[in-house]
């Protein structure tokens, strides 16, 4: 979303972080606006790291193989706390990850049931299905995927694994889900469970919460944070965190019934409260239809 770059209000001499490099779309747009400034990009995906090293050989650019949850620690180690002019985060799975069946994210193209963004560590989605109990699996589908038939699907999966040993491929899982609940809407019936499993395997929501918890220490006064989310769980976390720092009086009164707080507790202000992709962006990338942009500035 071009709006996300515009709303960062790039300082040509500033220090910026692209928390989710992907294939460098946002990084390239930021670098084009920098003169003596620098950009630090993060990604868990080794394919993204390789792409950055091959195609972004700029003296003012650095790529870090790590989750964005480690941004605070990186800034602490490099004496950058409170010196960052802006951070952009484009959450969720990237198009190259979805389009590569071998990565295991797609429920329409067959591949190994992996789903790890960082294939150098962690358990695969296939292993997770084997190790999780029915109750845990049902919880993941319900909470991370907002799946109405979570328990029914979890029971069917565990029964299938007991009879067949494992679920090894993406289409094997997608077909099992479809056979369990049928096709009741336009969306592929496997959509929610695949999302939930991916979030679990990659600790996506925990990583997001970890970054947002320390983000004020990273950003300088006047610095901006732009977050693009693609589903309600991510967006809810972002909105609630930002809202609590923009209007602490409202949050505290509603939750704790405490007296109104003084204005010194207000840490952020809205630049873009909520924005969706425009028609041109939708024509270029249909996957952006569910994207929500929120941008704040540190006071």
Curated annotation (Swiss-Prot):
Q: Which GO terms describe its molecular function?
A: rRNA (cytosine-N4-)-methyltransferase activity
Q: Which reaction does it catalyse?
A: cytidine(1402) in 16S rRNA + S-adenosyl-L-methionine = N(4)-methylcytidine(1402) in 16S rRNA + S-adenosyl-L-homocysteine + H(+)
GO cellular component terms listed in the entry, alphabetical order: cytoplasm
Q: Which domain of life is it from?
A: Bacteria
Q: EC number(s)?
A: 2.1.1.199
Instruction: Give the subcellular location.
Output: Cytoplasm
Q: Please give the chief subcellular localization of this protein.
A: cytoplasm
- Where S-adenosyl-L-methionine binds, per the record, is at 24-26, 43, 68, 90, 97
Q: Which GO terms describe its biological process?
A: rRNA base methylation
Q: Which Pfam families match?
A: Methyltransf_5
- Which PANTHER family does this one have? 12S RRNA N4-METHYLCYTIDINE METHYLTRANSFERASE, S-ADENOSYL-METHYLTRANSFERASE MRAW
Please explain the role this protein plays, according to its UniProt record.
Specifically methylates the N4 position of cytidine in position 1402 (C1402) of 16S rRNA.
What HAMAP family does UniProt report for this protein, alphabetically? Answer: 16SrRNA_methyltr_H
Q: Which family does it belong to?
A: Belongs to the methyltransferase superfamily. RsmH family.
What name goes with this protein? Ribosomal RNA small subunit methyltransferase H
The gene name reads: rsmH
């Amino acid at each position: 979303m071009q709006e996300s770059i515009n709303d960062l209000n790039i300082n040509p001499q500033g220090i910026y972080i692209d928390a989710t490099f992907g294939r460098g779309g946002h990084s390239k747009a930021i670098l084009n606006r920098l003169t003596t400034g620098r950009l630090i990009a993060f990604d868990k995906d080794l394919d993204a790291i390789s792409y950055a090293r091959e195609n972004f050989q700029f003296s003012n650019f650095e790529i870090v193989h790590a989750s964005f949850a480690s941004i605070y620690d990186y800034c602490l180690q490099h004496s950058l706390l409170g010196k960052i002019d802006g951070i952009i985060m484009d959450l969720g799975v990237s198009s190259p990850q979805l389009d590569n069946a071998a990565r295991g994210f797609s429920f329409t193209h067959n591949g190994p049931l992996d789903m790890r963004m960082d294939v150098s560590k962690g358990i695969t989605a296939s292993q997770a299905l084997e190790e999780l109990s029915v109750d845990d699996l049902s919880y993941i589908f319900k909470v991370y995927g907002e799946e109405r038939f979570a328990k029914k699907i979890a029971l069917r999966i565990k029964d299938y694994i007991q009879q067949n040993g494992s679920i090894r491929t993406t289409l094997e899982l997608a077909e099992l889900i479809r056979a369990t609940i049928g096709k009741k809407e336009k969306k592929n019936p496997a959509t929610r469970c695949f999302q939930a499993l991916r979030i679990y395997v990659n600790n996506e929501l925990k990583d997001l919460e970890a970054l947002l918890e320390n983000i004020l220490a990273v950003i300088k006064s006047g610095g901006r944070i732009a977050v693009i989310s693609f589903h309600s769980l991510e967006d809810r976390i972002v909105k609630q965190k930002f809202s609590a720092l923009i209007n602490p009086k409202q949050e505290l009164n509603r939750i704790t019934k405490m007296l109104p707080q003084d204005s010194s507790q207000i840490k952020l202000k809205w630049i873009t409260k909520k924005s969706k992709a425009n028609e041109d962006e939708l024509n270029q990338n249909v996957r952006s239809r569910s994207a929500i942009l929120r941008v704040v500035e540190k006071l």
